[in-house]
A protein has these predicted regions:
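Repeated loop/turn-to-beta-strand initiation elements of outer-membrane beta-barrel proteins
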Residues: 1, 29-32, 86-89, 136-140, ...
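Surface-exposed extracellular loop regions of Gram-negative outer-membrane beta-barrel proteins
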Residues: 1-20, 130, 136-143
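Transmembrane beta-barrel strands of outer-membrane/channel proteins
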Residues: 3-7, 21, 34-38, 47, ...
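Outer-membrane beta-barrel translocator domains and adjoining extracellular loop/strand segments
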Residues: 13-19, 46-51, 58-59, 101-109, ...
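Residues on the lipid-exposed face of transmembrane beta-strands in outer-membrane beta-barrel proteins
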Residues: 21-25, 78-82, 128-132, 142, ...
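Outer-membrane beta-barrel signature, preferentially recognizing the C-terminal barrel domain
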Residues: 31, 38-98, 107-133, 159-164, ...
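Gram-negative outer-membrane beta-barrel transporters
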Residues: 94-97, 116-197, 237-240, 261
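C-terminal beta-signal and adjacent terminal beta-strands/loops
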Residues: 99, 140, 189-198, 219-272
Length: 272
């Protein structure tokens, strides 16, 4: 068990104590963890006084808000982890309740953005991870995440977090003589999400962002005397996001990208 308290003292927002406690129990290959923590965050100078021209081209402005209140949160976590042989896996869950969460959203003019305190905000999530490390140099890893976020303003959920996501990785590395070859396939899928935003007329409009899949492939070879070659393909399946101008998690729109590098380590090259 580990417990502690963090104290904050601010000339404007006063004194605040934030306790935290963590527990861990091990039984054979199983490890159980749990914890509770209280958070306290005062608005930053950027969140209070920003007047930033996004991109420097007059597209839109990001404004601070001098009326922001400190953000207070309470979070509870639980997790279970198993490690046996080539396998490692875990399941974890968390719940966070925010009071006066500081967020960035559309300003009252309907064009620019401004920081604000959400009326009510919660964040609930579950993470599942599994990994296999084989003796032949192959490693497989996969993870699933579920998150349910509510950041309400006037009864509308302004959060744009995608509720479901999957990530996977396959790595292979093998030495042939004095040459080491490697390959890595990485991918991520994110579900669609519906969110609300405030338009220029002061009304609330619901918008949906479609699901997306993004993958990459990387190949590498390491030779004696410090020589190394790498080649990669980004956006392997040529995914192009229709919502890139509005979505917070931007995916490149240039299509498939090819990367190649050849490098040499001078220190290794000059070794006798």
């Amino acid at each position: 068990m580990l417990a502690g308290v963090r104290s904050d003292c601010h000339s404007k927002y006063g004194f605040h104590a934030s306790p935290k406690i963590s527990l861990m129990y091990k039984y054979g290959v199983l490890t159980l963890r749990g914890g509770y923590g209280m958070g306290f965050r005062i608005p930053s100078l950027k969140e209070l006084h920003s007047e930033y021209d996004m991109g420097g081209q007059g597209f839109f402005m990001i404004y601070g808000n001098e009326d922001l209140k400190p953000e207070i949160s309470h979070q509870g976590t639980l997790s279970a982890e198993v490690t046996k042989g080539i396998f490692n896996g875990s399941v974890s869950g968390y719940y966070t309740r925010f009071f006066d969460e500081i967020a960035l959203g559309l300003a009252p003019d309907g064009k620019n953005q401004q920081y604000y305190n959400a009326d009510d905000a919660t964040r609930t999530g579950i993470d599942v991870m599994a990994q296999f490390r084989f003796r032949n140099g192959l490693t497989l890893k996969g993870a699933y995440a579920y998150i349910d976020v509510h950041s309400e303003v006037d009864g509308h959920n302004m959060a744009s977090d995608r509720p479901h996501s999957l990530t996977f990785t396959a790595n292979y590395s093998k030495m042939f003589g004095k040459v080491t070859l490697s390959a890595a396939l990485n991918g991520r899928w994110m579900s669609s999400v519906e969110t609300w935003y405030k338009n220029s007329a002061g009304g609330y409009v619901e918008n949906e962002y479609e699901s997306r899949t993004f993958c990459s492939l990387n190949l590498g070879a390491r030779f004696p005397r410090g020589f190394r070659f790498t080649a990669g393909i980004d956006n392997l399946f040529d995914f192009r996001d229709k919502n890139v101008t509005a979505d917070q998690s931007v995916t490149p729109q240039r299509g498939i990208g090819f990367i190649g590098t050849l490098s040499v380590n001078i220190a290794d090259l000059l070794k006798l």
